[in-house]
Amino acid sequence: MYISKQPFRKSKQPFRKSKQTFHKSKQPFRKFKQPFRKSKQPFRKSKQPFRRRSRIGPGDRIDYRNMSLINRFISEQGKILSRRINRLTLKQQRLITLAIKQARILSFLPFRNYENEKQFQAQAISIITGPRHRKNRHIPQLTQKFNSNRNLRNSNQNLRNNNRNLSSDC
């Protein structure tokens, strides 16, 4: 089978434009007389770094004996503060929690600070509940039904007890 190798030929016909014409909008694009003004002062970077420094310095050792360091990561109630509040890395937080637990076991730290906790609970409860007002919810019809049902139950129980006593006497 013989395949002839013919060179690629360009068509001699000119490029035909599509029949659809481009519709220009009636209003031309507005050209402003004044060019866009760039602000003379470039964007200033804030003085403070974006990532805040952690509370642990480079020389601080995370150890159960380092009480000044450990106390920074414990709340007033004696609970270990979360990583979000502490701004620590995962590794640092893990070491801090281990040090705090070790200090508690070796009685360097109390497990909970009960004095501050009671005070905190009292404040939290008063904030949540607000002042307490007693409402008179006495509905005489319901209480009468309840009392009559209770009386029926008591009388039925008394009858059963009497029947047992009589059967045991025989």
From Swiss-Prot:
GO terms for cellular component: chloroplast; mitochondrial small ribosomal subunit. InterPro entries: Ribosomal_bS18, Ribosomal_bS18_CS, Ribosomal_bS18_sf. Sequence repeats lie at residues 4-10, 11-17, 18-24, 25-31, 32-38, 39-45, 46-52. Residues 7-55 have a biased composition (Basic residues). GO terms for biological process: translation. It is found in: Plastid, Chloroplast. Residues 4-52 are annotated as: 7 X 7 AA tandem repeats. PROSITE patterns: RIBOSOMAL_S18. Pfam families: Ribosomal_S18. Keywords: Chloroplast, Plastid, Repeat, Ribonucleoprotein, Ribosomal protein, RNA-binding, rRNA-binding. GO terms for molecular function: small ribosomal subunit rRNA binding; structural constituent of ribosome. Residues 1-59, 151-170 are annotated as: Disordered. PANTHER family: 30S RIBOSOMAL PROTEIN S18 (PTHR13479), SMALL RIBOSOMAL SUBUNIT PROTEIN BS18M (PTHR13479:SF40). Belongs to the bacterial ribosomal protein bS18 family. HAMAP family: Ribosomal_bS18. Part of the 30S ribosomal subunit. This is Small ribosomal subunit protein bS18c.
